[in-house]
Design a protein with these regions (language model features):
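Flexible "cap/lid" loop of the alpha/beta hydrolase fold
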Residues: 4-49
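Short, well-ordered alpha-helices that flank and scaffold nucleotide-derived cofactor binding pockets
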Residues: 11-15, 111-114, 142, 146
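Hydrophobic/aromatic beta-strand patches that form the interior of the parallel beta-sheet core
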Residues: 21, 94-96, 123
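Active-site nucleophile elbow and catalytic-triad environment of alpha/beta-hydrolase enzymes
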Residues: 68-85
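Short, conserved loop/helix-junction motifs that constitute active-site signature segments
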Residues: 86-90, 115-117
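Short beta-strand/loop motif that positions the catalytic acidic residue
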Residues: 89, 95-97, 101
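Conserved alpha/beta-hydrolase "acid-adjacent" motif
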Residues: 102-108
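Catalytic active-site module of serine/aspartate enzymes centered on a nucleophile-bearing elbow/loop
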Residues: 119-121, 126-154
Length: 154
């Protein structure tokens, strides 16, 4: 969800956007996304799971979980895609994606790389899942720092 929001902000405020980094951004709905969401729904039914989510979302944890699952699993959402917004993103983009992301295949960052309107670097992180910043923090920080330190194109 955060990656999609970041893409839309970069598109709407392109004059002010100097760079965009996405990590595990879902760009459309695919079967792997739906399978991951169904597995997440089952895991959040386990004792203590909602409490762990509350560490990040406080007393809104149940609402956040329901909004996320209900939206993405709704058949009316099946055709959603970032494709219309991506060509309007003109700042440099770094799209990081875990090779083992349980919510989306490498087709997501590839779509970002193919459609974004500015320079782009798509990087697949070997052995990482949906949260590479927690799974491989040193590697993610290094990649983001290198991207941000690179001279701006043009």
């Amino acid at each position: 969800v955060g990656g999609a929001m970041a893409v839309n902000i970069a598109e709407r405020h392109r004059a002010a956007c100097t760079a965009l980094v996405t990590i595990a951004a879902q760009a459309f709905v695919e079967p792997r996304t739906l399978d991951g969401l169904r597995a997440a729904r089952a895991s959040f039914a386990e004792p203590g799971a909602l409490e762990r989510l509350a560490r990040y979302h406080g007393d809104k944890a149940r609402w956040v979980l329901s909004a996320w699952l209900d939206t993405w699993l709704d058949p009316a959402f099946a055709g959603w895609s970032l494709a219309p917004a991506l060509p309007l993103v003109t700042c440099p983009v770094l799209a990081l994606h875990g090779e083992l992301d349980e919510y989306g295949s490498a087709a997501h960052p590839r779509l970002i790389g193919e459609l974004v309107g500015g320079p782009v670097s798509v990087q697949i992180l070997a052995g990482a899942g949906h949260v590479p910043q927690r799974e491989q923090p040193d590697d993610v920080v290094r990649r983001v720092a290198e991207f941000l330190a690179a001279p701006a194109p043009g």
